[in-house]
């Protein structure tokens, strides 16, 4: 076959179509068949969180388990006096007050995070909320 002279072609400015690598092309064509296994349903990010927020805002029950809270109260009370006894109503009153305080603190913390144009609360938001409340100088 005789050699022929090739003439220069004018460039179109863009990149031409590339050839795929053999391994990449093989990977695309030969996908393993799952055999009809259905994936578990997943909600979009944030949907479950919003559902939980609505659920907990509706409820009035205590969110911290009673026995772990009671152990914590007894452990803290040990530092002041040994062999202190607590009525069950006293522990429940302490738990109600502690949960009310924490809920209020988290509400203020969330406002601090929103003010900083964030949706995620951070420790600095808690510190700011406590400082504004006058609990910590």
Swiss-Prot record:
GO BP field: double fertilization forming a zygote and endosperm; pollen sperm cell differentiation
On this chain, the residues bearing N6,N6,N6-trimethyllysine are: 5, 10, 28, 38
Which GO terms fall under molecular function for this chain's record? DNA binding; protein heterodimerization activity; structural constituent of chromatin
Q: Which cysteines are joined by disulfide bonds?
A: none
Give the start-end ranges of region Disordered: 1-36
Q: Which residues carry this modification: N6-methyllysine?
A: 5, 10, 19, 24, 28, 38
Knockout or disruption consequences: No visible phenotype. The high redundancy of histones H3 might compensate for this mutation.
For the modification N6-acetyllysine, which residues carry it? 10, 15, 19, 24
Q: Where does the protein principally reside?
A: nucleus
Query: Pfam families recorded for this chain?
Result: Histone
Q: Which residues carry this modification: Phosphothreonine?
A: 12
Where does it reside?
Nucleus; Chromosome
Q: In which tissues is it expressed?
A: Pollen specific.
A GO cellular component annotation in the UniProt record:
nucleosome
Q: Where is the composition biased (Basic residues)?
A: 25-36
Mind telling me which InterPro entries this protein's record contains? Histone-fold (IPR009072), Histone_H2A/H2B/H3 (IPR007125), Histone_H3/CENP-A (IPR000164)
As for what it does, the entry says: Core component of nucleosome. Nucleosomes wrap and compact DNA into chromatin, limiting DNA accessibility to the cellular machineries which require DNA as a template. Histones thereby play a central role in transcription regulation, DNA repair, DNA replication and chromosomal stability. DNA accessibility is regulated via a complex set of post-translational modifications of histones, also called histone code, and nucleosome remodeling.
Quaternary structure, per UniProt, is:
The nucleosome is a histone octamer containing two molecules each of H2A, H2B, H3 and H4 assembled in one H3-H4 heterotetramer and two H2A-H2B heterodimers. The octamer wraps approximately 147 bp of DNA.
Q: Which family does it belong to?
A: Belongs to the histone H3 family.
Name of the protein in question: Histone H3-like 2
Q: Which organism is it from?
A: Arabidopsis thaliana
């Amino acid at each position: 076959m005789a050699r022929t002279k090739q003439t220069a072609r004018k460039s179109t400015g863009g990149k031409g179509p590339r050839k795929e690598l053999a391994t990449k092309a093989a990977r695309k064509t030969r996908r393993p068949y799952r055999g009809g296994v259905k994936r578990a349903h997943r909600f979009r990010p944030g949907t479950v969180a919003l559902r939980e927020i609505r659920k907990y805002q509706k409820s009035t029950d205590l969110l911290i388990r009673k026995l772990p809270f009671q152990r914590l109260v007894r452990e803290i009370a040990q530092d002041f006096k040994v062999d202190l006894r607590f009525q069950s109503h006293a522990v429940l009153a302490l738990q109600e007050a502690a949960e009310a305080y924490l809920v209020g603190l988290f509400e203020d913390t969330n406002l601090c995070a929103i003010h900083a144009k964030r949706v995620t609360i951070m420790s600095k938001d808690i510190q700011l909320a406590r400082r504004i409340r006058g609990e910590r100088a």
